[in-house]
C-alpha cells in the first residue's frame, strides 16, 4: 500500500488500526489539501492519503471508521470552490495518485467503453481515447482538467448536455468504495441503488475509484459558430428552439453567455470573436441595445466514414439552421477546428489566467440551474441589474433538458423540462490593485441567491454550499428523504465528504437528518 497517514492521525485510531502501513508527515501535501480553487475556505487535514488502488481507499476508510472522529474526503484536481473536498482534521484521499491505467472494453454487443480511474482527468481520457482508439465519450465539461470521479459526483455539464445528457447520464458502470470500507461494482442492472446514489451524490455515499464510460467514433472536425443578440427574449427563444430539435436537425453543442456592451477586454465584446483577431463591429448593434448583450455559441461535428456528407454538407446544415435565428446580422463569427482543439479551448483561458495571476486568486463562483419559466425575470433582475458591469469572467447562460437526466440519480434539478445553467465565473484580479474585495463578491452571490428565493424562482444551486440541514432539505426537496436513507445505508457513520456540510460525524448524525425530512 501507498498510504501516507500522519503519525498523529494513525495514533488517533483504535489499537487494531496498527495493521495499517507505516505513516509519514507530508506537510506540503496537507497544505495543498487545505485549499481549493475557490480560495475562500481553508481546512487542514490530519493526513493526506495517496492510494495506489481501490483497496488502499477502502483501507483508509476502514481506518477512519475505527476511530471516533476521523472523516474522509476524496480530492481530485482541487477545483472545488467552497471547501467541498476538504476534511478538517480528517483524511484527504489524493485521487490523482491512483494509477492512470485506462482500458478499452468491448462488450459482446460491440459497444465500446473506456474503463478509467476515478482520479483521471477528462483531458487524459480525451487524448487516450482519440489518439489510441479514434473514439470519444459523448458528454464533456467545458474545462477538461477535472477528474472523472469529481464530475460524476456532481453532474458534469456542458454544451453537449441538451443532446447527449450530462456526464452522469453517460456512464455504464462504477467501482465505488462505500463508507463501510467495502468495494462495490455497480451499474443500472447490478446494485442500481448505489449506482444512482453516487451519481450526483456529492461524495456522500462512496468514493468513485473507477468508471466505465461509453465511447463512439470521435468526430474529426468541428464547425464552431458564435452569433450576437441584443434582445434576451430572442436569444432565449432561439436557444430553446435549438435544444429541442430532433437529432437529425440539431447541433452537437449549444451554449451561450452574456457580456457587457463595451470594449472591456474581460467583460465586453472582445470576448466574442472567433478566430482570434476577428473584428466585432459594434456599429451593427441596434440603437436600443441595453447594457448587456448575449452570445449564442453552437457547434456541429463532422465524423469520418462519409456519414456527414463532407464539409459542403456540414456548411449547408449549419447555414440552414442559422438562417432561422434572430441574431444581429453581421455579428456572426465562425471557425473550423479539430475536435480535440475544440474541447480543449478553455486551456487558453487557464494559460492566460496563470500568466496574469488571477488563477491563483480567489474564485467566488456561483452556478445555478434556473427554470425557463423564470430565466427572463432573472435576466432583468440580475444580469441587467446587479451584474450589468460584468463579473470579471464569463457569465454563461444556456438551456438544457431535464428529460436527459435520470431522476434516480442524486442530482437536484428545477421542476421545468427546460432549465438554464447560469454560471458566474469570477476571476478576481490579483493584488495589488485588484477588483472589489472578495467578501463583497461573496455577499453579491448571496444576494443573487436571496433574489431567486424571494422571487419564487424555480431554481437549484449547482455545486451547492449550505451549512444547515434545513437548507439541504429545501435543496433536495422531494429527494431529501431518499438522500438521507441512502446515507444511512452506505455511510452510516457519516465518514465521507465532510466538507459538503450535510452530515456531521456524530453517533446521531444521520438520525438527526431524518428529523428534518420534508
From Swiss-Prot:
The protein's required cofactor(s) are namely: FAD
Gene Ontology cellular component list = cytosol
Q: Does the keyword tRNA processing apply?
A: no
Q: Tell me one GO molecular function of this protein.
A: oxidoreductase activity
Which reactions appear under catalytic activity for this entry? Answer: N(6)-dimethylallyladenine + A + H2O = 3-methyl-2-butenal + adenine + AH2
Per the entry, induction is:
Strongly induced by abscisic acid (ABA) and leaf senescence.
Q: Major place of localization?
A: cytoplasm
Loss of this gene results in the following: Increased cytokinin levels in flag leaves, reduced abscisic acid (ABA) levels, increased branch, tiller, and grain number, and delayed leaf senescence.
**What Enzyme Commission number(s) appear in the record?**
1.5.99.12
User: What are the BP-aspect GO terms?
Assistant: cytokinin catabolic process
Residue(s) carrying Pros-8alpha-FAD histidine: 79
Per UniProt, where does FAD bind?
74, 76-78, 80, 84, 142, 147, 153, 157, 208, 462, 500
Q: Where in the cell is it found?
A: Cytoplasm, Cytosol
Domain FAD-binding PCMH-type residue range list? 41-218
Expressing tissues: Expressed in inflorescence meristems. Predominantly expressed in roots, leaves and panicles. Induced by abscisic acid (ABA) and leaf senescence.
Question: Could you tell me which PROSITE patterns the record lists for this protein?
Answer: FAD_PCMH
Keyword Disulfide bond assigned to the entry: answer is no
Q: Which terms are listed as keywords in the entry? A: Cytoplasm, FAD, Flavoprotein, Oxidoreductase
Q: What does this protein do?
A: Catalyzes the oxidation of cytokinins, a family of N(6)-substituted adenine derivatives that are plant hormones, where the substituent is an isopentenyl group. Catalyzes the oxidation of various types of cytokinins in vitro with high efficiency toward trans-zeatin (tZ) and cis-zeatin (cZ), and lower efficiency toward isopentenyladenine (iP), cis-zeatin riboside (cZR), dihydrozeatin (DHZ), and isopentenyladenine riboside (iPR). Involved in the degradation of cytosolic cytokinins.
Assembly and interactions?
Monomer.
Report the family membership.
Answer: Belongs to the oxygen-dependent FAD-linked oxidoreductase family.
List the protein's name. Cytokinin dehydrogenase 11
Q: What is the lineage of its organism?
A: Eukaryota, Viridiplantae, Streptophyta, Embryophyta, Tracheophyta
